[in-house]
């Protein structure tokens, strides 16, 4: 019964519909009585606020989580909120804290904390460290993240293996499994793109379009060279969240292929640089610009 209470909330979370997750948890607050269930709901509630960029709210509401009675998961959420609020400024201290927690054994049996730490490592592009944290994990969110990391480092074989493990834990038609398979199909390319696109479209029709689902559809459309369709999907995503870095990156890619005016493309590149300095697209642009400056200096 406990799992049923949070089922819709978690499903919205996996789909990237963070406000609906928050709304569902708030609506069912009187049913969330058990201590373990309250801890679970708080975890997803604060993850949503963090995803929305409401870092100060999380830090303010959890400020009493200190001392001998400190909840490790809440401490992890505080660390994530603090880190994301000022990544460059808080990077060193965050990584030191994580190292200490790992050394103290705090992380080993706390799968929520494992995901939080892996998220920070992923953001810092420390993929080996993230994989070590999630090594041998057998929980849904951890496996979903493992698949993301394996795809990021071009290990499609290991992503497929993690997906096979996931299918043993949850129904293949459950949202996390459908999302994971769709991304694996995207990386397989060619005919698999059609299957991935259908999956994203079906989820969007069933649960409503979210930036995550719209971006998934757009990536498929770009891969199939259906750039006008991709543009329409990405503009819809921007209307829902103008600060979604993946939407901006995919729109840049789409507009380059559509040969849109340079000033339009550059405007989105500048926006992405400001919002997400560590995004793969930002890093690639910065590297290209640096190489251009080096080449230019040789002729001065």
Swiss-Prot record:
In alphabetical order, the GO MF annotations are: structural molecule activity
Report the InterPro entries cross-referenced here. Answer: Coatomer_esu (IPR006822), TPR-like_helical_dom_sf (IPR011990)
Task: Name the family the entry cites.
Answer: Belongs to the COPE family.
Topology versus the membrane: Peripheral membrane protein
Q: What does this protein do?
A: The coatomer is a cytosolic protein complex that binds to dilysine motifs and reversibly associates with Golgi non-clathrin-coated vesicles, which further mediate biosynthetic protein transport from the ER, via the Golgi up to the trans Golgi network. The coatomer complex is required for budding from Golgi membranes, and is essential for the retrograde Golgi-to-ER transport of dilysine-tagged proteins.
Query: What domain of life?
Result: Eukaryota
- Which Gene Ontology BP terms does the record give? endoplasmic reticulum to Golgi vesicle-mediated transport; intra-Golgi vesicle-mediated transport; protein transport; retrograde vesicle-mediated transport, Golgi to endoplasmic reticulum
What do the Gene Ontology cellular component annotations say? COPI vesicle coat; Golgi membrane
Tell me what organism the protein belongs to: Dictyostelium discoideum
> This chain belongs to which protein, by name?
Coatomer subunit epsilon
